[in-house]
């Protein structure tokens, strides 16, 4: 994907560079640098301003790179080791983590280092490989986001139909198709990527398209396939999910008020027991309105029979309890789901809309785009797109209670704490007398030896 082609500035001007840079059909892979050579008149900046801009840029690159690599590696390890998290949704999250990790590793170092050095020193093979892997990683990440949106829509709003095909084997086939489709779609990148001199001892890894018309068609194709279509799919799917959850929230609120009114009128159930809430259908979702957990999405909430009986016997209907009532807990869980869905769609558009807009602008108006975006603007636009690689782990996984617990379990397994040694009694002290709690853990034979006799 043309993430890194806009800024044509390099460190230090060289003779003859203007003709090569301004030739139609040439687009650079390097996006940003500390220098100011471009097809247009360079901007005059003070040395202090340039150094401050470079320091901020390097710091942001380093922070985003470390967060992306660390967060996605943690996701891969946790999802790979935890059997409880091997679900259909988490299979897509694992693929998303791999693509985000590939985006961080294949894009960011090869964007920052050539701009700091002023030339591309890695050769033609690395140039073509980086260009290809960059496009594949962005395509896979975007298609995975759309696949997750469709999977969650099916699971929440069409659960009966989804149970037929929503299996891990089907998810594996979809993920494989996503990677193969992305690999085929990005074949033009290594074909039209070259390392070309643009000045004395200055090389650039660039996309050299056959014509300006081809470049425009390619930019529009990527804009449609990797932004508009996935964006519409995500917006519609999460909009329908939010609507479904909102209807469930309103129904639960009305049902809760009706239940409280009935309890006040009837004086409560015998013995102060609470009856389980009604099961109702709402747009294809089967809602159990009184029993839920933190991770519930409001559909197919099923609890073990023993837990159901304990809840039925111990949940009071009158008087405030120490924690939220089951119905209130369900409402809170649904609100968290709605908030997370809104954050997902917002992050997608915020991170990717500037990049796709800038690439399309440059394809149709190169000089105007270079005048407006050369230097820091396009560099920070690309940093914003890289932010998605570290934002996805935070949104999709670290907001999930079970994943947080799995992270703690994995860390405890990898770094076990040494057993604490019990302090030995001093010579003039009596040994500690076993307590009732410790005696209860002993066998009958051990307890009998401590009795009178």
Curated annotation (Swiss-Prot):
Q: How does it sit in the membrane?
A: Multi-pass membrane protein
Which cysteines pair up through disulfides? They are 127-205
- Protein name per its UniProtKB record: Gastrin/cholecystokinin type B receptor
Q: Which GO terms describe its molecular function?
A: cholecystokinin receptor activity; gastrin receptor activity; peptide hormone binding; type B gastrin/cholecystokinin receptor binding
Query: PANTHER family per the record?
Result: G-PROTEIN COUPLED RECEPTOR, GASTRIN_CHOLECYSTOKININ TYPE B RECEPTOR
So what family is this one in?
A: Belongs to the G-protein coupled receptor 1 family.
> Region (Disordered) spans which residues?
257-276
